[in-house]
Amino acid sequence: MATILPPPGTALFRHFTRQSLATIERLKEETLIAPKAGAHEEEEPPTPNPDLEAGKSLPMIFGDPPSELLGTPLEDIDPFYKAQKTFVVVTKGNTIYRFNAEPACYILSPFSLVRRGAIKILIHSLFSTLIMITILSNCVFMTMSNPPAWSKTVEYVFTGIYTFEATVKVLSRGFCVGPFTFLRDPWNWLDFMVISMAYITEFVDLGNVSALRTFRVLRALKTITVIPGLKTIVAALIQSVKKMVDVMILTVFALAVFALVGLQLFMGNLRHKCIRWPIANETASELFNGTVFNDTLSYNDTTWLNDTLDSNSTFDFTEYIENAENQYFLEGSKDALLCGNSTDAGKCPEGYLCMKAGRNPNYGYTSFDSFGWAFLALFRLMTQDNWESLFQLTLRAAGQTYMLFFVVVIFLGSFYLINLILAVVAMAYDEQNQASQQEAKEKEEEFQRLLEQLKNQEQAQVLGSRASLTSKKSVSLTGSDVADDEQSLENNEALKDCNGRPIPRLIIRAPTMKESAADYELREKEESSVHSVLHLDEPGLRERSASVATAAASVATAAASVATAAAMEELEEAQRPCPPIWYRFADIFLKWNCCEKWVVFKKWVHFVVMDPFVDLAITICIVLNTLFMAMEHYPMTEEFDYMLSVGNLVFTGIFAAEMFFKLIAMDPYYYFQVGWNIFDSIIVTLSLVELGLANVQGLSVLRSFRLLRVFKLAKSWPTLNMLIKIIGNSVGALGNLTLVLAIIVFIFAVVGMQLFGKSYKDCVCKISSDCELPRWHMNDFFHSFLIVFRILCGEWIETMWDCMEVAGAGMCLVVFMMVMVIGNLVVLNLFLALLLSSFSGDNLSVGDDDGELNNLQIAIGRITRGGNWLKAFLIGTVQRVLGREPQKPAEEDPADEGEGKTEGMEMNHLDGFKLADGIANCLVGGQPSGVTLDGESSITVPIALGESDSENPSEDDDDQEDDVDSEVTCEENEHHSDGVEDEFGVLQHVKLMGALTDGDSSVCSTVDYQPPEPEVQEEEEEEPDLVEPEACFTDNCVKRWPCLNVDISQGKGKKWWNLRKTCFTIVEHDWFETFIIFMILLSSGALAFEDIYIERRRTVKIVLEFADKVFTFIFVIEMLLKWVAYGFKTYFTNAWCWLDFFIVDISLISLSANLMGFSDLGPIKSLRTLRALRPLRALSRFEGMRVVVNALIGAIPSIFNVLLVCLIFWLIFSIMGVNLFAGKFYRCINTTTAELFPISVVNNKSDCVALQEATQEARWVNVKVNYDNVAKGYLSLLQIATFKGWMDIMYPAVDSREVEEQPSYEINLYMYIYFVIFIIFGSFFTLNLFIGVIIDNFNQQKKKLGDKDIFMTEEQKKYYEAMKKLGSKKPQKPIPRPANLIQGLVFDFISQQFFDIFIMVLICLNMVTMMVETDDQSPAKEDFLFKVNVAFIVVFTGECTLKLFALRHYFFTNGWNIFDFIVVILSIAGTMLSDIIEKYFVSPTLFRVIRLARIGRILRLIKGARGIRTLLFALMMSLPALFNIGLLLFLIMFIFSIFGMSNFAYVKKEAGINDMFNFETFGSSIICLFQITTSAGWDTLLLPMLNKEPPDCDPAFENPGTDVKGNCGNPMMGMVFFCSYIIISFLVVVNMYIAIILENFNVAQEESGDVLCEEDFEMFNETWEKFDTGGTQFIEYSQLSDFCDALQEPLRVAKPNRQRLIEMDLPLVIGDRIHCVDVLLAVTQEVLGDTIEMVAMRESIEAKFNLNNPTSASYAPITTTVRQKEEDMAAVVIQRAYRNHLHKRGIHHAAYIQRSKTGRKAASEDAPEKEGLLAKKMGALYGSDADLADEVEGLRRRPDPQTRCSGARCSPEPPEPNIILVPVEITNELLLHSAPSQQSSPTQTILRETNV
């Protein structure tokens, strides 16, 4: 954070003069000299203050600069620039501009008049406005597809204005030299480019002008430079694009691999068509009478045919098969029907044969014939655009088995990679968000300090002027009496006390009607002042400084100091947006307190209007009004229509009356301060306007505004409120992003129109049979915009084919891919990221702090209480009549206490008037009723359960104790009148008393009621197995029927008990459970055989019927056994047992029906399908599945909540759709061609009916999915929201005219806007909410189960994770190097990293050669590729052979080697036997693709690939969870496919149902359901189900092979089936998949952000293996230094490292060896730093390692490195000390001998050394033996070999002057008692150091 702002005030602003320039130059010189002087004291470099950046507003603290200084050059106010040549200019709006003080363009100095004029123009607000208007006008002109002649002149004007702008900028700033000049701002490059292009295209002829004109569209980007805030969003986008690089690389790589697989599997397949056969031509048919053509023609054998036919020139076979007339086309299809020659591929109809002919489907663009097209097809699959079409084409041509390929691509490619992009964008957004929050927080802290300073200065004055705030009479800061809770703090911000706890808003005052008008008025005014203190939300204030607002808000909400609040109020008054006169006007005209009677009347109105019952009534009216609007349909009777219109009038009246009375009760001034009231007033006004304009044509859309009343429900429905808030917040936050998106859409729409518009016009016949422009084209701006919008929705491929056909493939691909990647993958994902960030755990459990919600609860509470009283009264009356004594409440069973009874609860925070009814009876005669003042007893206040805010009346002790603290703040309420104060004291006492006893209620307030924190529960343990059976029946049953109480100790009872024990033993046995699971799986599998062919397979049918009886019998036996074993009580309290019971019942019923002959009854058939639920029970036994199911069940409430909210949200669009389109989708069609009659022939229904009677060829039909009523509207909206079948709804909508009129092509074009708006709000928002809800739910459930790391700090978690990773690994024993010389050399060669990389490069080259392959390639190319492939096989075989030779049998210990070996064997076999393998299996080239997996190995070697490794790691982490979800999904598909088979097997084959994709067999059902799991094509499967009567279907249709008649569908069943499947699979299960990926990506990201990761430990192990060749897990201490140096960062300890290694204190075992775990722990600690808490962690990791590695038994340390070093040092110190001691003794003795020789010895002096070694030797040296002395002297003069310290041994240093040298021979004997030397003691040393 930059330094604190300079001292505030205007004295800081000084004119920029020549003197200022001189000062800057002087300072600059000083700064240049200063570094040389004090280089060593350099602090961190200063940074510019972010608050004073150019373009920012001047911070408030500076005040307003004097007017004469505005717009003139001033000295720079940022201290950072004091020594730089810059100056600033501040505009009238206090915006800062910074300029370079060097002469602009070397000519204009800062003091030049021209430059000053240019600056004045540049900073003027009108200048930017002019530029903005110019850009927008220019954009409007660019949207013209056929510009008028004069537009050229306008173009010149625009260019002129842009040139003028650039000139002004250059003159004021300079061109490019120095900071803050024109070209130093990257945004100005854009301007420069645009202007340059304008002049270049004008003066230089560059050919294709329209392509160059598209450059003009970049001018739209200039809006980004002009609108503040857009630059930051663009920066965020660029940031996320940078972060996406890794994902993009991974995606491209994965797509390339899949494309290669696709290329090998499906090359040429999509050209197999059905050709008419036999040939009608006689000459040809003679040729083909051979037997070959009685079978199907094999794929590519047409060549010999052509050779055969060459001789016969009259018939050209190629031309015959290429001719479209000889190919089989389905009705309405542009492409011929595909077919295949494998058994499960599509078959040709009679008279046709499957051959390869013609081009590929979709203009030839959909194919796998070359790598490029295969890649495009895979990209399409990954983005899931119209992929069902590709899926169906491929399966039809290649066979249904290949569904597996699509499953893999959809799950890995689509779900995983696309959502990784979302995860990355979300993370980038999140990081930026956190950074900005951090910045704001720092700013606020800084501002707080400044504010403190200000406050101290002004305190005395403030306290004097605002004393009224603290007066006794004043209202407390805790609430407001005037309005209902709507008047409370906006955004429901609770007030807080000094501890940050919420202050209750409760004001207990007996509601009295006697309060005088004056008091009322005074109180109201005081409240308003407090209200305004707490509402610093004025826009003016916000504009000046966001941080002030936040600081002010935090000061106000702290509510610790009234003085601060007063200061802030003054501050606010200064910043009020309106002049004071308006406030005076408001006081006079908008606060209605004219006379006392009026005030009393007003209070009565307030009392009534604000009553909870009125709220309840209004809510009921809203619901009824919504129902009335939803009842509109087509066709309606007149009576019904009249009823609806009357209803509308009534509701409009009710809502108008509510608004009117609220205005009276609250005064307009306060009424319009509440958001909901403004919302109400707008709707009421619009409703009234609509009544007036009811008959005006075209204004019926006003009726739609009434629908917004539905949103009023949000006041009383937290989830809807949350949704609206989230959308509100997002739209607010998205304001800038939406603008960016709009600019992107605009630019691409214009680019498309400019580049391709002409081509669409000229080449239209290529894509349209009638040569009219199709609906999707780019010839004008609106249609071009629609295409771009459609691409944003994810549908790009179909429009791109059209574009490629008319305008060429290259350009279209570039433009469409850019829109797709930039618009869809980046910007839309940023939308979603923003939406997800709006979610937090609190959002879904929205607190009840919304006033209106309490009102509803109170009203419902009263009703409940009334109902309970009535019930009790009636029961009492009946009992008295019957002569019984009514039960006293006191005697009630404690268990039932609180159910519907009044109970002591926390009192609601009700304002004065709300107390009128609900709590009035608490306060009777100045004492709270229900409060006993007996000191002993606990005290409660009666309140109806429903009236409480809290959902959970009894809290835990802890919570209550906490509450005591927070709620003591109630004493702030002593601002009330004295009478209430007394009561209040009691109430406080009450509260404290209540807190002592569990379950008693707090009386003070529940405004701060938080639901108790979810307890950290341990995951439910499996209940311990019961040893014997429990009781059969519950205690109540036994009480009621005593005969059930059996004595089990004797007689029959004992036998019964033994029987139960036996059954229990059987049931509890593992084998029993396994057997039952096996039976369940078998019975489920049996269901899959009951398809439409069952009647033809009599044997199978008989077997299945018999098996069904057996299964039923087994399950009944199982159920009975369990009843006997467990008893009814246990059995029927288990949900899985209930499921079992339900399924067994179904089986029994259907079996009984079969035996009685009722098997053909519809209900019985439906019941049979419910047997498909059987697998659920088996899967309840699988742990993984159960986890997913539990998670799902946990999420169901939230999912339903959101589903309900979505339905309400969609209801508005559905009703609007009914208003706009009901009855308008009907059309008159030609029954033979299914084409529409033009309006010139048929104008309306009556014309059509007449034509039908005349010719029988016309029919008046409706579109199947329409808006004729709200339910159908919902279906339409679901199709639009999933983007499936939405075209079939949009086209009739834009063609519609009026009810019962024939539609006309695009006559109602702007109806597209309805769909665009719905897609944005109904699809982008609400569907993505599901992801938000599910992710949020997962996180909440995690919290509930308790993260295992709750009790660890962040640092410890990192440590823990690191430890976890390294504990699970151990170094492997490396493969020993062979003793043989040649083998050894080869071993060294293949162990090199270079060898690995070389092989990887070869693999990649091999892939490249595969990519070059195409369908129908020339023989020469084929031959060349074959040879290259053989060469590669030889190389890889060579690699394999070398490894086998060098590694011997160890080769097979590595998984990768085995993998390589198998691939090589398969490749060789594939080359040799390619024809046989291809005929019976898949193409052998696939084996080469498998080799790509090896590239995964190289990722570890590349440092830059860490990001990609993270992504793959995230995938690996997700796999187990994804497998569980996959299982669940399969289960759902299984159940639905069985259900589909029994209900939709015989529907008419049309739309999406055909011979291959249908519900006739289990296989084809599963294929259809897999397809619609991604919501693809579900609309086409639904359409045939909607046929219910002729002529759409034929009820008498004969289905061959069965006795089932008819091919009509069941519309209701179809809609329920498909909608429920879409919601369950597409919205819930698939989103769980996404949630897991996002979660794991975040985890992986955190892990990769850790200092140490998995790879570092692997690298450690690999390095260790090189040093510990025996795999002993120990190395020599002497090797440690080299080992630590050989490690890679971050674990490396570089040389010289001896000292650091010793300090690590590593344990040594016998033989000075060190264990790997010790070294690893030590280097890890070096990286992470040392903390005390890690001791326990180390112990646990060592224990874990010992567990994993039994080899470490010998791991018993005897010393450590530090200890060893200490011992060495100790030895040296002892030796030195002993030597010094000997020197001293020697010197004493030598001096004595010398004195003896010279005769100076005193007579009484004795020899110091009388006996011992020293005396003996010195006697020998100095006593008598002179020769010996000379010899020693000679020895002394020899040079000494040892000079310096080495290790722990220190050698003698050279002698110093003035030292007497006494030669002493010290032998081993002499050193006997010294410390042991480190290595070996020298036998002879000469002692030289003698200090005298």
Curated annotation (Swiss-Prot):
Key words of the record: Cell membrane, Disulfide bond, Glycoprotein, Ion channel, Ion transport, Membrane, Repeat, Sodium, Sodium channel, Sodium transport, Transmembrane, Transmembrane helix, Transport, Voltage-gated channel
| Swiss-Prot/TrEMBL GO biological process terms | membrane depolarization during action potential; neuronal action potential
Reaction(s) catalysed (UniProt annotation): Na(+)(in) = Na(+)(out)
Where does the record place Acidic residues bias?
948-971
Each IV repeat, start to end:
1375-1673
Transmembrane as a keyword? yes
Q: Any idea where this protein resides?
A: Cell membrane
Keyword match Disulfide bond: yes
Give me the Gene Ontology terms describing cellular component: voltage-gated sodium channel complex
For region Disordered, the annotated ranges are 34-54, 884-905, 945-982, 1836-1856
Q: Which Pfam families match?
A: Ion_trans (PF00520), IQ_SCN5A_C (PF24609), Na_trans_assoc (PF06512)
Q: What are this entry's molecular-function GO terms?
A: calcium ion binding; voltage-gated sodium channel activity
Cytoplasmic-facing ranges? 1-125, 173-186, 228-246, 424-612, 663-676, 717-732, 832-1071, 1122-1135, 1182-1198, 1332-1394, 1443-1454, 1503-1521, 1638-1892
Q: Which cysteines are joined by disulfide bonds?
A: C274-C339, C348-C354, C765-C771, C803-C812, C1228-C1248, C1593-C1608
Question: Glycosylation positions?
Answer: N208, N281, N294, N341, N1230, N1244
**Biological function:** Pore-forming subunit of a voltage-gated sodium (Nav) channel that directly mediates the depolarizing phase of action potentials in excitable membranes. Navs, also called VGSCs (voltage-gated sodium channels) or VDSCs (voltage-dependent sodium channels), operate by switching between closed and open conformations depending on the voltage difference across the membrane. In the open conformation they allow Na(+) ions to selectively pass through the pore, along their electrochemical gradient.
Subunit:
Voltage-gated sodium (Nav) channels consist of an ion-conducting alpha subunit which is functional on its own associated with regulatory beta subunits.
Specify the protein name.
Sodium channel protein type 4 subunit alpha A
| Organism, as annotated | Takifugu rubripes
